[in-house]
Amino acid sequence: MGTSDLRNAPPGTWLPARRLARWIFQPLERFLHVQAASGIVLLIATAVALAWANSPWAASYERLWHTPVRLGVGSYLVERDLHFWINDGLMTIFFFVVGLEIRREIHQGELSVLKRAVLPVAAALGGMLFPALIYLALNPSPPERSGWGVPMATDIAFAVGALALLGNRVPAALRVLLLALAIIDDIGAILVIAVFYSSSISVTGFGLVAVGIAGVLALQRFGVRSPVVYAAAGVVIWAGLLSAGVHPTITGVLLGLLTPVHPWFGEEGFLAEARRALEDFQERATGGHDARELTGPLAQLSQARREALPPVVRLEAALHPWVAYGIMPLFALANAGVSLGDVHLGAAGSTRLLLGVVFGLTMGKPLGIMVACSLSVKLGLAALPRGVLWRGVLVVGCVAGIGFTMAIFVAGLAFGAGQRLGVAKLAVLLGSLISALVAMAVGRLVLRPAEAGQIAATADEAEASTEY
């Protein structure tokens, strides 16, 4: 056994087996480091769900996601189906990662300047208003009129995955703009659901949310660093939002925005703490101490390593792979299976409903986002992020037309069950697919890979840019 093999393999390793494992898993590891890999996995999961839901085995698809799952402690039990725990439980972690990224950008990124933070707010408002107006123009009368909220929503998971397929053509600031826009859009959609599509709102639930948020702030004041304790406070917030009739995944956004952005030790503190830990380790190791006594300096070194980074950065790095390759594909598999067998476009009002949703997503979203961004910049209220040109905003507008699961959810509230719901689902599917394809085509035409590194020299240059 060579020296390099001794260094690269734990004691007791059978080297032929280790080489075989490396030969098998290295291509997978290289794939996972490709920027668009998460988007590819997401699209594969979507295709599987669609094929499964429209196959002879469609009943097994429905049966799987309606499997009851019971969680609880002692006599307090909550039983919901698997679909609920994925959409309202696991997706909270996705929203937490999104909240972390937004928090980091607000602190030291492109959103740290108020003038630039205004842009995603304006984009989200325009991206909600124009689709609703287009839909209402085509469907002015009830009962189809009640579906005006369907094309307003942007599906963050699918939109981010689709944008990832463009790889290094997408500047980091453009992705942040989409994330911020989609978060605000999603909050807007939830407010629409709460105000126009909800039967009742529980004030008690919001009281529980306030208690949870106060708990998080108190824990930070006491210097508590354990993620488990904060997760417990997050469960309280989640339960409060669920009880209040608000989508509980907003818990993730709230916790992400509350996450500290300053490290405990920092760079200099880490070096000093690590130096002390290594000196202690060397003293104990050379002094013939029992191996168990080495755990102290190693724990000290581990704490220094952990606290050298801000919690917002550390948590984002730890959770991102799980979200990108686990939660998001599972979410797609559970939600993308739209059965099209019962859709009849010949029924009264069906064609207008279909066109209202499709045009709202494919035309209303990019048009509303472009108009709102242009007005806010021209009026001096906002500025384009550094490195983002108007052509990039156009791509974001197209990607934002991927409504999918949130749009389907709103459709269920607007139309209940029956023919109109089937048409609305088909329209959401078509509109989202067209938006994704148009975004890919436009992105490959107008965004060049080199642009990822071409940053506007100044904020004024980015703001004044009219180049597409």
UniProtKB/Swiss-Prot annotation:
InterPro entries: Na/H_antiporter_dom_sf, NhaA. This is Na(+)/H(+) antiporter NhaA 2. It is found in: Cell inner membrane. One of its GO terms (molecular function) is sodium:proton antiporter activity. Belongs to the NhaA Na(+)/H(+) (TC 2.A.33) antiporter family. It catalyses: Na(+)(in) + 2 H(+)(out) = Na(+)(out) + 2 H(+)(in). It comes from the Bacteria. Na(+)/H(+) antiporter that extrudes sodium in exchange for external protons. Disulfide bonds: none annotated. Pfam families: Na_H_antiport_1 (PF06965). GO terms for cellular component: plasma membrane. One of its GO terms (biological process) is regulation of pH. Keywords: Antiport, Cell inner membrane, Cell membrane, Ion transport, Membrane, Sodium, Sodium transport, Transmembrane, Transmembrane helix, Transport. The chain crosses the membrane at residues 31-51, 82-102, 118-138, 147-167, 176-196, 199-219, 226-246, 321-341, 353-373, 393-413, 422-442. It is a multi-pass membrane protein. The keyword Coiled coil does not apply. The keyword Cell membrane applies. It comes from Sorangium cellulosum (strain So ce56) (Polyangium cellulosum (strain So ce56)). NCBIfam families: NhaA.
